[in-house]
């Protein structure tokens, strides 16, 4: 399986058994009925720091010789890795410097400080993760501190692999499919290594954000490549460049990689919360969102999805609902030229909107000395089939309009 062997993961499990939570593997009735198969969720959202990252961080730090830790450790992260390192520093009583982008939400910064207590200092620097990463590495070299990589160190990968060991110990059935998210690749390479060693017939499916397909593109080109730009919405898995170690392992263990649209992930997050009271972060929900793209293959099979984390900022829920509605074809935005006369809005509501259509946004400024004025309007539909009926009525009434959903530049500017 490359650089990481099953024995490395067994050793990691011995290191971690009294530190991390052996998280539950739960059969999900809703998903099992929907896809006509047995779907199990590995609940890493119930881990100590609400994500799997504690496993690799603690195993890596605890394996470093004591004399090399005199000056402490340093890392860069915008979230879960930082919390894992902070918790490890506090538990092992090792000083740590954690570099985070200046754009990191205060809630995440506060969580890192909470887990690290007096052993950790958070340094906010740079506008992006890459900026923070480079500064952290330079700082570590200058101050002779040990750098803890989020995904590209062997002990990190072995630590994440203990998720797979727990899955195999807990499940009674043979696993046909394993769905796991890919960011830098540390989790899937560790989990996949263990599971493929025990169950070679299991198909390991990697799940990447459609807006950040770093592993898929690297595998396509046969080498690790760096993407020029990415959609950062799935913050736990949106990386420009995967790790060299995970890449080598993924070349051997992956059956397929599915690119999951961000809007589909948002729909899944909302469904998990509404149906099962599960709070999943975008990267954690991604493997579950991917099931839709394999619904024919997995029918009648045993499927495991690794729900990798639950550190979801509640302030993002409105944005997630919006992205979900747009992806499902239920939310549409237009700029419509309205006649500047009394009764025009009433006509629009009566003649254009359907009985179940709802106006969710309406912005209008009257233009003097003009017969028409632009209106920014948002319309939410009850079902996606209503869209064509809405457009038919809009065209029959002769309104001049532009669909913002179909214009990326306008959408990013106005919505």
Curated annotation (Swiss-Prot):
Disulfide bonds: none annotated. This is L-threonine dehydratase biosynthetic IlvA. Pyridoxal 5'-phosphate binds at residues 80, 183-187, 308. It comes from the Bacteria. Catalyzes the anaerobic formation of alpha-ketobutyrate and ammonia from threonine in a two-step reaction. The first step involved a dehydration of threonine and a production of enamine intermediates (aminocrotonate), which tautomerizes to its imine form (iminobutyrate). Both intermediates are unstable and short-lived. The second step is the nonenzymatic hydrolysis of the enamine/imine intermediates to form 2-ketobutyrate and free ammonia. In the low water environment of the cell, the second step is accelerated by RidA. It is an enzyme of class 4 (lyase). NCBIfam families: PRK08639.1, THD1. Its cofactor is pyridoxal 5'-phosphate. GO terms for biological process: isoleucine biosynthetic process; L-serine catabolic process; threonine catabolic process; threonine metabolic process. It catalyses: L-threonine = 2-oxobutanoate + NH4(+). PANTHER family: THREONINE DEHYDRATASE, MITOCHONDRIAL, THREONINE DEHYDRATASE, MITOCHONDRIAL-RELATED. InterPro entries: ACT-like_dom_sf, IlvA, Ser/Thr_Dehydratase, Ser/Thr_deHydtase_PyrdxlP-BS, TD_ACT-like, TD_ACT-like_sf, TrpB-like_PALP, TrpB-like_PALP_sf. Pathway: Amino-acid biosynthesis; L-isoleucine biosynthesis; 2-oxobutanoate from L-threonine: step 1/1. Gene3D superfamilies: 3.40.50.1100, Biosynthetic Threonine Deaminase, Domain 3. The keyword Lyase applies. Residues 332-406 form the ACT-like domain. Belongs to the serine/threonine dehydratase family. It comes from Halalkalibacterium halodurans (strain ATCC BAA-125 / DSM 18197 / FERM 7344 / JCM 9153 / C-125) (Bacillus halodurans). Its EC number is 4.3.1.19. Pfam families: PALP (PF00291), Thr_dehydrat_C (PF00585). The modification N6-(pyridoxal phosphate)lysine is found at residue 53. Keywords: Amino-acid biosynthesis, Branched-chain amino acid biosynthesis, Isoleucine biosynthesis, Lyase, Pyridoxal phosphate. Homotetramer. One of its GO terms (molecular function) is L-serine ammonia-lyase activity.
């Amino acid at each position: 399986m490359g650089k990481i062997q099953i024995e490395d993961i067994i050793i990691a499990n011995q290191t971690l058994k009294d530190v991390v939570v052996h998280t539950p593997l739960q059969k999900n009735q809703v998903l099992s009925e929907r896809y006509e198969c047995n779907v199990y969720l590995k609940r890493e959202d119930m881990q100590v720091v609400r994500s799997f990252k504690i496993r690799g961080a603690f195993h890596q730090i605890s394996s470093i010789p004591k004399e090399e830790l005199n000056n402490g450790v340093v890392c860069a992260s915008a979230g879960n890795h930082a919390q894992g390192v902070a918790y490890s520093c506090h538990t092992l009583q090792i000083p740590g410097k954690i570099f985070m982008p200046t754009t990191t939400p205060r809630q995440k910064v506060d969580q890192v400080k909470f887990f690290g207590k007096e052993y950790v200092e958070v340094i906010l620097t740079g506008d992006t993760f890459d900026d923070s990463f480079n500064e952290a590495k330079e700082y570590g070299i200058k101050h002779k501190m040990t750098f803890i990589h989020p995904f590209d160190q062997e002990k990190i990968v072995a630590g994440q692999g203990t998720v797979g060991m727990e899955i195999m110990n807990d499940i009674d059935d043979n696993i046909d499919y394993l769905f796991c998210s890919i960011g830098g690749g540390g989790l899937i390479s560790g989990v996949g290594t263990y599971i493929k060693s025990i169950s070679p017939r299991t198909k390991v499916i990697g799940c990447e954000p459609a807006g950040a397909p770093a592993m898929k593109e690297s595998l396509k080109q046969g080498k690790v490549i760096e993407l020029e730009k990415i959609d950062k919405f799935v913050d736990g898995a949106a990386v420009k460049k995967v790790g060299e170690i995970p890449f080598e392992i993924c070349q051997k263990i992956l059956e397929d990689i599915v690119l999951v649209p961000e809007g589909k992930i948002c729909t899944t997050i909302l469904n998990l919360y509404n149906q099962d009271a599960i709070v999943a972060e975008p990267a954690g929900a991604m493997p579950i969102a991917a099931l839709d793209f394999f619904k024919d293959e997995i029918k009648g099979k045993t499927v495991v999805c690794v729900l990798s984390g639950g550190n979801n900022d509640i302030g993002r829920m409105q944005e997630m609902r919006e992205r979900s509605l747009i992806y499902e074809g239920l939310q549409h935005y237009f700029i419509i030229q309205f006649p500047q006369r009394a009764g025009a809005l009433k006509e629009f509501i009566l003649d254009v909107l359907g009985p179940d259509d709802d106006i969710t946004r309406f912005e209008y400024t009257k233009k003097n000395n003009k017969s028409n004025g632009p209106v920014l309007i948002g319309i939410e539909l009850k079902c996606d089939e209503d869209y064509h009926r809405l457009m038919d009525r809009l065209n029959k009434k002769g309104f001049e309009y532009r669909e913002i959903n179909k214009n990326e530049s306008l959408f990013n500017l106005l919505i």
